[in-house]
C-alpha cells in the first residue's frame, strides 16, 4: 500500500472578505483544499483565524477547526480590524497568511437615532435622517409616542413643522389615546397648538378617558392656550365620556386654579353643571379643599343649595371631610342668602 504522501505547506492566501456589516465580518478561505479532502479528518488541514489586538500588537485565536468560513461578530461600527489565517498540517507543520485589514460599516440609522434627534432638538440630524429615507416617520418610541408627539410636548416648533411637512400623521394617538394636540395644550406650547390646528388636528378627539384637548389644557393651566382654544371654537363645556366632567370640573378636581376657572367662566362655562353623579364644580372644589376656588365659584353664582344624586349638599360634604376653612365660607354664604318662605 502506498504511504500517505506528505505535501509541504505553502504560504496560504489571506482570508477572503465576505459580507461586512456595522457589527460583523464574514471571512472564508482555502476553497481549493476543501474540494481535495479525503480520508479521516485527522488527515485534513486545520484552520485558525487570528485577530490582532491593536493595543498589544499581538494576535489571538478567534476560530480554529476544519471549516472554511467564519463570521466574526460583536464588533464596533466604523472600526478597522486585522486578521490572518493559520494553516496547520496533520504533522503539526503550520504557515501564516498575509494579514487582511477590514473596516466595519457605519451603524445604520434606526428609529432610536430618529427619536434621539427629536428628543434633543437636533434639527440637522433629523433632516439628515429624513432625507436618508431609512426610518418610518410615524414609528413610535418605546413609550408609544411618535416623534411629533414628543416634539409637540417639548415645544420644538421647528421640528414639529419639519415632521408635518414630511408627512407625519397629526392625529395619531399614544397608548392612553392622547394625540399631539392634547400634549401641546397640556404643556402650554401655543405656537405648536396653532400650527397643529392649521394642519388638521381636531378639538373633538378624545383620549381613552374620554377627555378632549381643552380638558388637558385646563389641567396644564396655561391661560394663553386656553383663551386661544376657546376663540378658535373649542366648546367650553365639553363633557368627558368617563365622569361627565367639563374643563371647569377638571379645574375643581385637579389644580384649583382661579385664573383658569375665571377664564372658563368668562367664556360661558356653566358653574352649576352636574356630572354623572350629580356633583357640581362647587362640590368638587369643596371635596378637594380648593378654598380660593370655592370663593370664586360662589362669587360667580354657584348654587350652594343643590344636592347630588345621593342627596348630599356642599355643607354636608365639607363637614364630613372636615374642610373647616371651606365650611366657614359656605356658612358665611348661607347667612347672606335670602331665606325662602316654607310651609311647616
Swiss-Prot record:
Mostly restricted to testis (at protein level), including mid to late pachytene spermatocytes (stages VI-X), diplotene spermatocytes (stage XI), meiotically dividing spermatocytes (stage XII) and spermatids in steps 1-14. Highest levels in late pachytene spermatocytes and spermatids in steps 1-9. It is found in: Nucleus; Cytoplasm, Cytosol; Cytoplasm, Cytoskeleton, Cilium basal body; Cell projection, Cilium. Residues 11-108 form the Fibronectin type-III domain. Gene3D superfamilies: Ankyrin repeat-containing domain (1.25.40.20), Immunoglobulins (2.60.40.10). Polyubiquitinated. Polyubiquitination leads to proteasomal degradation. Pfam families: Ank_2. Disulfide bonds: none annotated. Its main location: nucleus. One of its GO terms (cellular component) is ciliary base. InterPro entries: Ankyrin_rpt, Ankyrin_rpt-contain_sf, FN3_dom, FN3_sf, Ig-like_fold. Induction: Expression is activated by FOXJ1. ANK repeats lie at residues 109-139, 143-172, 176-205, 209-238, 243-273, 277-306. CDD domains: FN3 (cd00063). Keywords: ANK repeat, Cell projection, Cytoplasm, Cytoskeleton, Nucleus, Repeat, Ubl conjugation. GO terms for biological process: positive regulation of DNA-binding transcription factor activity; positive regulation of DNA-templated transcription. The fibronectin type-III domain mediates interaction with COPS5 and RYBP. Interacts with COPS5; regulates the phosphorylation of JUN and the transcriptional activity of AP-1. Interacts with RYBP; may prevent the ubiquitin-mediated proteasomal degradation of FANK1. Through the activation of JUN and AP-1-mediated transcription, may regulate apoptosis. This is Fibronectin type 3 and ankyrin repeat domains 1 protein.
Amino acid at each position: 500500500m502506498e504511504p500517505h504522501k506528505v505535501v509541504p505547506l505553502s504560504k496560504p492566501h489571506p482570508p477572503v472578505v465576505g459580507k461586512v456589516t456595522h457589527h460583523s465580518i464574514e471571512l472564508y478561505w482555502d476553497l481549493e483544499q476543501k474540494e481535495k479532502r479525503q480520508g479521516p479528518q485527522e488527515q485534513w488541514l486545520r484552520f485558525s483565524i487570528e485577530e490582532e489586538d491593536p493595543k498589544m500588537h499581538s494576535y489571538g485565536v478567534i476560530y480554529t477547526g476544519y471549516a472554511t468560513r467564519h463570521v466574526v461578530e460583536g464588533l464596533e461600527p466604523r472600526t478597522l480590524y486585522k486578521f490572518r489565517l493559520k494553516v496547520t498540517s496533520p504533522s503539526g507543520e503550520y504557515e501564516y497568511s498575509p494579514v487582511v485589514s477590514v473596516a466595519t460599516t457605519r451603524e445604520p440609522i434606526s428609529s432610536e437615532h430618529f427619536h434621539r434627534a427629536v428628543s434633543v432638538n437636533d434639527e440637522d440630524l433629523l433632516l439628515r435622517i429624513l432625507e436618508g429615507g431609512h426610518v418610518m416617520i410615524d414609528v413610535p418610541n418605546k413609550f408609544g409616542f411618535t416623534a411629533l408627539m414628543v416634539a409637540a410636548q417639548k415645544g420644538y416648533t421647528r421640528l414639529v413643522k419639519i415632521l408635518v411637512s414630511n408627512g407625519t400623521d397629526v392625529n395619531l394617538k399614544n397608548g392612553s389615546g392622547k394625540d399631539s394636540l392634547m400634549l401641546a395644550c397640556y404643556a402650554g406650547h401655543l405656537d405648536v397648538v396653532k400650527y397643529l390646528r392649521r394642519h388638521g388636528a381636531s378639538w373633538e378627539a378624545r383620549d381613552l378617558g374620554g377627555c378632549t384637548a381643552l380638558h388637558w389644557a385646563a389641567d396644564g393651566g396655561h391661560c394663553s392656550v386656553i383663551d386661544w382654544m376657546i376663540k378658535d371654537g373649542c366648546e367650553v363645556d365639553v363633557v368627558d365620556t368617563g365622569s361627565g366632567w367639563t374643563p371647569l370640573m377638571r379645574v375643581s378636581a385637579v389644580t384649583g386654579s382661579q385664573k383658569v376657572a375665571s377664564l372658563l367662566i368668562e367664556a360661558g362655562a356653566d358653574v352649576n353643571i352636574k356630572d354623572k353623579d350629580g356633583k357640581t364644580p362647587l362640590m368638587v372644589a369643596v371635596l378637594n379643599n380648593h378654598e380660593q376656588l370655592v370663593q370664586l365659584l360662589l362669587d360667580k353664582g354657584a348654587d350652594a343649595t343643590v344636592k347630588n344624586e345621593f342627596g348630599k349638599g356642599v355643607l354636608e360634604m365639607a363637614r364630613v371631610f372636615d374642610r373647616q376653612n371651606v365650611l366657614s365660607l359656605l356658612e358665611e354664604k348661607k347667612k347672606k342668602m335670602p331665606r325662602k318662605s316654607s310651609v311647616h
